[in-house]
Amino acid sequence: MADAKTLHLYQRHGDYIPRVAAVHDLCGYGKCSLGVAIPVLSAAGCDVCPVPTGLFSSHTAFPGWYMHDTTNIMEDYTNAWKGIGVEIDAVYSGFLGAPEQVDRIRDLYATYPNALRVVDPVMADHGKVYPTYTPELCDAMAELAAGADILTPNLTEAAIILGEPIGDDWCGTDISDAEAARMIDALVAKG
């Protein structure tokens, strides 16, 4: 893990363009996931190498969505990069389609040990876990979060990572500064 005092999303060296593996889902309809990450990171001056974790007809807020889990292709997909000498400066992960995908992200960490590890643990919001997320997938995401250089959970995701209860009566949208600080300290203590 990188030293927090020296963390930068990227540092430009001359004409060098930093390369980010963006490990996230791709939605055909709805502004989220790789559809947002690719243009934002590109506008920030990064070369984005997408690694789709799932293909969605739309995000899960729309009724009747379809998901195709891409776990079975991820290893061959990223191993092909090794064959052509692709170098990665950051691994940015978001929505995952299955617990096994954490192993594919760890493979990227092992292949690119100096890459910045950015984890956006996309799995829940407003006290509710997304419909594709099982307890096993939430646990796997919490394990992945512990190895992040930069972690960007919302309040619900932070509670899940910390093993704190959430639900319909959960008021995680209005917390005190002291409670937010407690959660941040607990997340940092996890790794």
Locate the predicted segments by residue.
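Conserved N-terminal subdomain of the carbohydrate kinase-like
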Residues: 2-119, 123-131
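Conserved phosphate/ATP/ADP-binding segment of small-molecule kinases
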Residues: 132-191
